[in-house]
A protein has these predicted regions:
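Gram-negative bacterial Sec-dependent N-terminal signal peptides
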Residues: 1-20
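Short gly/pro-enriched beta-turn/loop segments at secondary-structure junctions
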Residues: 194-200, 207-213, 246-248
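Outer-membrane beta-barrel biogenesis signature
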Residues: 19-37
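Transmembrane beta-barrel strands of outer-membrane/channel proteins
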Residues: 32-42, 88-94, 150-158, 205, ...
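Repeated loop/turn-to-beta-strand initiation elements of outer-membrane beta-barrel proteins
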Residues: 82-88, 143-146, 211-214, 262-265
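Post-signal peptide N-terminal segment of secreted/secretory-pathway proteins
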Residues: 73-77, 81, 85-87, 93
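Residues on the lipid-exposed face of transmembrane beta-strands in outer-membrane beta-barrel proteins
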Residues: 74-78, 132-138, 152-154, 201-207, ...
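Extracellular/periplasm-exposed beta-strand and loop segments of Gram-negative cell-envelope proteins
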Residues: 43-69, 92-132, 157-196, 221-252, ...
Length: 315
């Protein structure tokens, strides 16, 4: 699938060049549009640990879940030519948001389907989340009523969490789930950060009927570079992982109404996912100064859903 999509995008310039050679090429420096919107972000990000000595099975997973974090989103697009557009957009959380984290371990190799240790941290905060996207679009069809094109771009996104307090159930001294308790309220447990960097390719289109306009896009990357930083404050240990060549999928749809010839109000929804893949981890012990590096023991995953309402203006 990766090579097929890449082939389609790479052959698009041939069609665009043919279109340009017909004499339709012209600069349109005045055709610039901007939009701003407000909305919410919900989703889940996951970190995993695998044991290569036990066939690479999963031995730990932390799920960081967030819901309805307020975001602000903006974009600017320049129709450089009738068949070529440049764009930049991004979004950011407006403030931190309450979230939830669950940490589970499967440490019994003889009963791999049953967790042995679990801690729950309902007092978790999504400290921040943000993203920027730079892209270029080539229009195969570009008419007042409809557009269809291919695009390529570069995108980065970041997430930061902090878990405090919570409860736990541990299996200690060879027993099973025999120790239960709670962490002091406000005590820092784990701090976690994720970062995703990726080039991508995709398709984009829109259709207008009278004052109504509908649009959508699909983006794909098989070249995601993910990294994370996991701080275990009580143990004074830091885990830093890197994963390469993960898959990314994004689907977005919008609907709008032109209140004036240049201004449109719109609603938009997007679903985004970065699939799990194994990577490498470096461990740093701040108590002793020791460090270690292991291959194929980490897993990083993220998915989210975003809804926004906004205003677009074309100059």
């Amino acid at each position: 699938m990766r090579m097929k999509l890449l082939g389609i995008v790479l052959t698009a310039p041939v069609a665009l060049s043919s279109f340009a050679s017909t004499g339709a090429i012209s600069f349109t420096p005045g055709n610039i549009s901007t939009d701003i919107s407000l909305g919410t972000l919900s989703g889940k990000t996951k970190e995993r640990v695998y044991n290569p000595d036990e066939g690479g099975r999963k031995v730990s997973q932390l799920d960081w879940k967030f819901s309805n974090a307020a975001i602000i989103k903006g974009a600017i697009n320049w129709d450089l030519m009738p068949w070529l557009s440049l764009g930049a957009n991004g979004w950011s959380t407006i403030d931190s948001r309450g979230s939830n984290m669950v940490d589970k371990d499967w440490l019994d190799p003889h009963n791999v389907g049953t967790w042995t240790d679990e801690s729950k941290h309902p007092n978790t905060r999504l400290n921040y989340a943000n993203e920027f996207d730079l892209n270029i679009k080539g229009w195969i069809l570009n008419e007042p009523e409809y557009q269809l094109g291919v695009m390529a771009g570069y995108q980065e996104s970041r997430y930061g969490f902090n878990a405090t307090g919570g409860t736990y159930i541990y299996s200690e001294n060879g027993s099973f789930r025999n120790e239960m308790g709670s962490f002091p309220d406000g005590e820092r447990g784990i701090g976690y950060k994720q970062r995703f960097k990726m080039p991508y390719i995709g398709f984009i289109g829109s259709y207008r009927y009278d004052s109504f306009e509908f649009g959508g896009s699909f983006k794909y990357s098989g070249w995601v570079e993910a990294s994370d930083n996991d701080e275990h404050y009580a143990r004074a240990i830091t885990f830093r992982s890197k994963v390469k060549n993960q898959n990314y999928y994004s689907i977005a749809a919008n609907a709008g109404y032109y209140v004036t010839p240049h201004a449109k109000v719109f609603v938009e929804g997007s679903w985004n996912r970065i699939t799990n893949k194994k990577g490498d981890t470096a461990v740093y012990d701040k108590n002793t100064g020791a460090s270690d590096y292991s291959k194929n023991i980490a897993g990083i995953e993220n998915y989210n859903f975003m809804t926004t309402v906004g205003l677009k203006y074309t100059f």
